[in-house]
């Protein structure tokens, strides 16, 4: 890693990866005077230490100081160097030359023992809710207990509990209406997905489950019959790999379903589940407590269809991560990585074992976690230990971006971006999941309407004022509302596509699928009724992003965030790019830095913006050599 400011340069080189040995070289201009006490200062998060650097030689007008340091612990280190001259101490950090005290937040950052697979950095991801994406013609669904089958792909989904089924079982049973989207259906559409520039396919859970979302696992070892079979997963992975795409599977290891072979509340399986048999071989899989001599099982957030697993249980860990266990079986079928559901509720020890199992199968296996807050500040080793996950879903950034584009909240966006740059490992930043939307929040297009359905000062930008499903069901966008929202949406997408991380497109966002809140956001993909204009825009963004390979790992520098414009730079070893987006409906004049005004630039635009004029909801990206 080399950093240079004017006459100063600092280079830190990892010359022995196995031992984490680093060599530090500092170049200082001789004209400044007689240097002494040249030191490298290192903050490991717990304490600040220093290494004396020795004068090795003079090279032209520079004095060269060098030294070696061993960083044994996986951590994010912050460092700078200092020197004394004429009786004063100077610090050289990320902000340039300072003559005041050492401040860790201003230091350069060095991530030790953090390696994310190259294929998972700076790519485009496609997130599929399997039941709602595409149904192959041969998928004839057979009736099964506690399942409802739709006759028509385009008919409305069921909202709320299924009345008849709930009555039979004496409790509310939701999300059991199926359209039949399946793995073969996805395989049939791989060329379409590839046309969006996608190289990572992220599938919602596919294993046997009672519900259509399949976060209530019934059998980890077999694909749900409505989604296909294990062979179909193998074929999908093989065909995806032929097209240069990797496959990431949603992994739900925090809880199972109550209607599963492990819990088996309804005796749907062999009756040997933990619910009816305290001596079951599965009973140690679950969290439980005793009251008056009776066993009571714990349920995830009180949902009675989701008994909570005991992540500290050796039996449970072995079943999932042991040799020949669940993870091994999935990787045998060809997957390339996992997204850990509710990762913040899994123990670090369990996640470490998951990582060992993943890497046992594929050295470049990828692990992404569902963590909603800054993972570096939760007192956990999700990322910082270097032994758990590679990256997380980027809820903080998406929340801040949405607030900026809807409410002009400049401060939040500035704070979150600087927070991420300061605290996350570089390769984690490059692989963050920057999503258009997900199965848990409203569709992106809804957010950009003038409708006042969202709460500006809620915890999250997508929090709704009214969560009543019947109310939200009737909130349909008019053509005029949709087109106006699409203008803003495009500007937002332009900014999103050029930022660090993986852009994740939730199926249907590229063609204008709408829906407020959880459930209504899970409509079927509208084959034959797509918004072709929006689709072409997504294809163009994907092509533009993939054309600039340096963006996969380029750094990020904020330029300006004001009530109209958001601008930033991406800076790589050989190329850099200036990005400016207009969140307002006003045309404006912009002042481009001189270095971006030469003839040797490449330009990407939205709404015919130029280097002089940025159009309403327009944008421009200018790439040049460094």
Regions found by a protein language model. Give the residues of each.
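Structural recognition of the beta-strand scaffold that forms the well-ordered cores
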Residues: 125-127, 200-204, 248-249, 338-339, ...
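C-terminal beta-strand-rich structural cap/linker in extracellular carbohydrate-active enzymes
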Residues: 124, 608-626
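Aromatic/acidic polysaccharide-binding cleft in carbohydrate-active enzymes
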Residues: 131, 382, 434-468, 472, ...
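Substrate-binding/active-site clefts of carbohydrate-active enzymes
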Residues: 130-200, 206-333, 354-360, 377-378
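Active-site-proximal helices and loops of the catalytic beta/alpha 8
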Residues: 237-246, 254-255, 260-271, 326-328, ...
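Conserved, mostly hydrophobic/aromatic
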Residues: 128, 193, 203, 220, ...
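Glycan-association/targeting regions that enable binding to alpha-glucans and other polysaccharides
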Residues: 1-127, 135
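Carbohydrate-binding surface patches
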Residues: 13, 559-595
């Amino acid at each position: 890693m080399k950093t240079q400011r004017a006459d100063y340069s600092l280079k830190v080189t990892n010359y022995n990866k196995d031992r984490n040995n680093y060599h530090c070289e500092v170049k200082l201009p001789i004209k400044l005077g007689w240097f002494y006490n040249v030191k490298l200062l290192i903050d490991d998060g717990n304490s600040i230490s220093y290494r004396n650097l020795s004068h090795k030689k003079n090279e032209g007008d520079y004095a060269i100081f060098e030294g070696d340091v061993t960083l044994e612990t996986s951590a994010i280190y912050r460092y700078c160097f200092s020197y004394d001259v004429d009786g004063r101490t100077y610090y050289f950090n990320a902000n340039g030359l300072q003559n005041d005290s050492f401040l860790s937040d201003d230091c350069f950052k060095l991530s030790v023992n953090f390696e994310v697979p190259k294929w998972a950095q700076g790519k485009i991801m496609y997130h599929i809710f399997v039941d709602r994406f595409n149904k192959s013609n041969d998928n004839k669904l057979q009736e099964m207990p506690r399942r409802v089958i739709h006759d028509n792909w385009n008919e409305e989904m069921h909202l709320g509990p299924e009345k008849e089924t709930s009555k039979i079982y004496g409790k509310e049973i939701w999300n059991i209406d199926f359209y039949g989207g399946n793995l073969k259906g996805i395989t049939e559409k791989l060329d379409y997905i590839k046309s969006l520039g996608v190289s990572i396919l992220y599938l919602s859970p596919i294993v046997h489950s009672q519900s259509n979302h399949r976060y209530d696992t019934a059998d980890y070892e077999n694909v749900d019959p409505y989604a296909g079979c294990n062979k179909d997963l193998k074929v999908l992975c093989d065909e995806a790999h032929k097209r240069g795409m990797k496959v990431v599977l949603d992994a739900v290891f925090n809880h199972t379903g109550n209607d599963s072979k492990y819990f088996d509340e309804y005796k749907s399986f062999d009756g040997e589940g933990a619910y009816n048999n305290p001596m079951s071989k599965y009973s140690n899989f679950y969290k439980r407590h005793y009251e008056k001599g009776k066993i009571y099982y714990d349920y995830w957030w009180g949902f009675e269809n989701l008994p909570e697993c005991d992540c500290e249980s050796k039996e449970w860990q072995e079943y999932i991560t042991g040799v020949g266990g669940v993870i091994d079986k999935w990787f045998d079928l060809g997957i390339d990585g996992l997204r850990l559901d509710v990762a913040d509720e899994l123990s670090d020890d369990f996640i470490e074992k998951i990582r060992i199992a993943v890497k046992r199968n594929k050295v470049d296996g990828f692990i992404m976690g569902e963590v909603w807050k800054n993972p570096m500040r939760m007192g956990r080793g999700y990322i910082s230990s270097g032994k758990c996950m590679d990256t997380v879903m980027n809820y903080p950034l998406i929340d801040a971006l949405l607030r900026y584009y809807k409410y002009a909240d400049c401060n939040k966006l500035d704070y979150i971006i600087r927070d991420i740059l300061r605290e996350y490992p570089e390769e984690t930043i490059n692989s963050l999941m920057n999503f258009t939307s997900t199965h848990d929040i409203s569709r992106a297009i809804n957010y950009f309407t003038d409708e006042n359905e969202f709460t500006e000062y809620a915890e999250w930008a997508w929090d709704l004022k009214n969560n009543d499903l019947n109310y939200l069901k009737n909130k349909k966008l008019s053509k005029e509302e949709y087109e106006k929202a699409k203008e803003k949406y495009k500007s937002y997408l332009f900014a999103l596509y050029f930022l660090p991380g993986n852009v994740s497109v939730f199926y249907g966002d590229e063609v204008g699928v709408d829906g407020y809140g959880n459930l209504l956001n899970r409509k079927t993909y509208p084959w034959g009724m797509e918004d072709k204009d929006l689709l072409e825009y997504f294809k163009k963004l994907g092509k533009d992003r993939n054309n600039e390979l340096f963006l996969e790992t380029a750094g990020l520098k904020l330029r300006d965030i004001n009530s109209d414009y958001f601008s930033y730079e991406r800076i790589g070893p050989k190329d850099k790019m200036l990005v400016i987006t207009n969140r307002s409906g006003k045309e404006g004049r912009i002042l481009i830095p001189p270095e971006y005004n030469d003839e040797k630039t490449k330009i990407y635009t939205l709404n015919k913006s130029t280097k002089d004029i940025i159009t309403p909801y327009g944008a421009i990206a200018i790439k040049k050599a460094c």
